[in-house]
Structure formats: structure tokens, C-alpha cells
Amino acid sequence: MSLTLENLSYGVDGVDYVRNANLTFQAGSFNVLLGRTLSGKTSMMRLMAGLDKPNEGRLIFNGQDVTGLSVQARNVSMIYQQFINYPGITVYENIASPLRLAKMAESEIDRRVKETAAMLQISPLLKRYPLALSGGQQQRTAMARALVKDATLVLFDEPLVNLDYKLREELRAELRDLFRERQCIAVYATTEANEALALGGTTTLLHEGGVIQNGPVMDVYRAPVNTLAAQLFSEPPMNMIRGRVTDTEVAFDEYSHHALTQELSKLTPGDYWFGVRPSHIALAPANDDDLEMSMEVALSEISGSETFIHIDNSHFEMVMQLMGVHQYHTGAPVKVYLPINKLFVFDSAEKLVHTPSRKSGGAV
């Protein structure tokens, strides 16, 4: 069983929401659509569900063209970021509602509702009403209603965004495990790179309605095809700094030079973009060949147990991500260290030409 998007495009009033998308989703797979707000994630899922019709292209399900099929004729479920439950009926009846619409036998309804409730750990809540539930319990109820009908295609439109961090982690792990056992196609939209990594499976990077890259999550993360993909799949976005490679060294500015390592010596002389993840910039060298840079603090932000420090000099700006709480005043000078063995390299056209080698300890 598979769903293929073939040259799919969709737009309204001259605004393109999906541009020439070509993707295939397989049964038993968990697929993540990762992109910023307005990148086309929701529009793409609405096309898959049959809620909107494409301007161009086709949707192929199991070899059959289903582009014009109504949403009612498709076996699809969609879960939104809002907790959409019917407040006037119990959790049991909320979950049972799509089965009653399908005129299923009462005994089968009861079996499916109780089985799905147990799977999502809400069995004790079946007699309660949605407004008496916590946010996490309400979202579990909405998920149960979507899953109880055994849809062949299950779409998640940022379903955990309104939950607190701990609940999100918990439900994320449950979803990942749940779909390992189900022979349906799951598609999950998110704006967060860390969520895509946690969910695993296949990741599709979207930008302004277009597919930038698609593949197994760690392949996309470790080998982004260009600078845009690298920045989309990094939280905060990967830092990009301009550098020039000569026969003997790489220079980032008049003060920051580094002798070519064995790996970087394979680059032909010229101008490149060098990418470094914010979490890989350090306040002390981890290796003898780490590149030292003199910077100035532009902004320091503490978020939970992490500190994000925006730093710059006359040539470039970067963000560094540090574990723990660190206090830095705006304008304070700071020396930072970039691990040469963890640099991504992109050519002047911003295409990937070098990834950090796992053999050299640069796996990212």
C-alpha cells in the first residue's frame, strides 16, 4: 500500500501553497513534514485528505488515481493542533462517533473503543466529558477518535504544539511506538527539527510549498543537500559563515585562519560557505585544532536549562547554544571555538560538498 504525490501543485489567487511536489509514502511508515510556518505542510495534507483539490498533478493510492475522490470516499483521519472533541458527549461516545456514522455493529464499536482507549491509556476516562479533561487527555481523546476507524492514511497537523514540554515528549514516544505496529500511512507535520529527529522515520523538508529534501531522518540531518536544508533541519538554524580555501589553509577573516585538515584538503581552492550547528560552538577548545574566534555578545537568552548567545564581529554573526545557565552582558567580548571536524561545507551555489566524517569524531 502506498500513496504517491505526482507533480502536485496547489494555489489560490496567485499564491502557491504546494509547488510540483513528488513524494511517495509507504504503508507501515511514519513520515514527517518539516518546515517553517506557511511552508505548505497543512496544504499538502489537505490535498492528501481530499479537503482541497490540486491545480495540477495527481494523487495515486495503490496504483489508482484518487485525485478527484471526495473526502468521504477516502479512508483517512486527520488530527489537528486544537483539541477537537464534542463537549456534550462522553469520551467513549467521542471515540465511537466515526464508527456510529459508519453504522458499525454495537459489539464491534465497543471492542474498538475499548481497545483504542487502552492503547492511548485513557480507559479510566471513558465516562468523563471532554471539558473535565486535561489538555493531554483531550488530545489523546482526539487521537483515539482518529485511530479507532483504522484509517489507511492518518494525518497529524502539529497535534502536540499546544501541550506542555513533558506531555509532548510522552505523546511523541507513544505515537512513534504505536505506528510501528500499524500497517497504515502516517504523515506528521511539525515546525520543529528536534521533533522530527525524535519521531524518526522519513523526513521531508518543505519551504515555500516546495520539497527541498526527502529521505530517512538521519540521512537528511547528516547530509543536508544545501544551506537551506541545513538551516531548516537545525534548531536554532545552522550558522553559515563565509570562508576561502587556498592550497594550504582556510581563512574566515583576516584573523581566523586554519591549516587545511586532511578532509578539507580535498576541497578545490575557492569561496565556500561553512556550516556549524549552534550546539557545536564552545567557550573552550575540545580539540587541539579547534578554530578560535574573537566575537562580541549581541544578545543572551536563557531558555529553560539552555542559554542561546548571539555573537558577532565585523565579518559575521552566529548563535551558540550552551547547556546550563550563563550570564553574558551585551557588548561583552568572548572567545569561541569552532570544531573543524564538525564543519559542513557548501559551495558558492550553496550546494553541499562536504559533511563531517564520523571516523574523525565529527558525526552530527
Predicted segments, located by residue:
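Non-catalytic connector elements of ABC transporters
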Residues: 249-364
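Conserved coupling/switch loops of ABC nucleotide-binding domains, chiefly the family-specific signature
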Residues: 53-58, 208
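ABC ATPase nucleotide-binding domains
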Residues: 74-77, 81, 85-226
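Conserved hydrophobic segment flanking the Walker A/P-loop of ABC-type ATPase nucleotide-binding domains
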Residues: 25-27, 338
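The feature captures the beta-strand-to-loop junction immediately N-terminal to the Walker
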Residues: 34-36
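Conserved structural motif at the start of ABC-family nucleotide-binding domains
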Residues: 3, 18-20
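Conserved ABC transporter NBD signature motif
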Residues: 57-65
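Helix-to-loop junction immediately C-terminal to a conserved catalytic motif
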Residues: 49
